[in-house]
Amino acid sequence: LYEDEDGIIWVGTDGGGLNRLEPKSNRFTHYPNTYGYKVASITRYNERELLMYFFSKGLYLFDKRTGNLRSFTLLNDRRNEEIIHSGISVNVDYFDTDKINLFADKIYTYDKSTGSFTIAHVADSSRYYGTVQRFYSDKDITYLFGRNYILRLDHAENAAVCLLAFGSKAVINAACRDDEGNFWIGTDKGLFHYDVNTQALNEIKTNMFRE
């Protein structure tokens, strides 16, 4: 799901392509030329276009007015093809003016103003593998979660460090950052709260769910 600056909600489906929901009118629009595509992630590209990743197909720019698609190459043709056929998804995030993070086998940043890519340094990267998902970002930092860890990406330094790792104790399914800057983490072992300042991790006892 992605909500654009006009309040339109873009709904990516697993094989049904892209859909548009206008909340004020409850009007729902399907784009037939995207049917059959598995939409893995969506973000802003500019006022007119969205950037999205279709699983095993690649990155595409989608024109919100015409519904037309055009391909977008990640880094270069060779690397782009390798990622498409790797079986991983690329998660995309427009985090600042003309800058987009692309989370794949590595953390890539695309600068639209220069048309260039950079790759973030991840401390002890051999321990933190697999696709990561963004759960908070602003112009300075992005927080990401992987299978059993949380990373903090510093945009100025173009480097990421691990803030928290569960190891084999739990698998992270979801995470969010609250208004106080702390994390709520949903895992296969229950709900946890992480205090960023004290680095205290506490399990939240609840009977709302088992996982």
Q: What does each model-identified segment do?
A:
Residues 1-211:
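Carboxylate-rich, polar loop motifs that coordinate divalent cations or form catalytic acidic clusters
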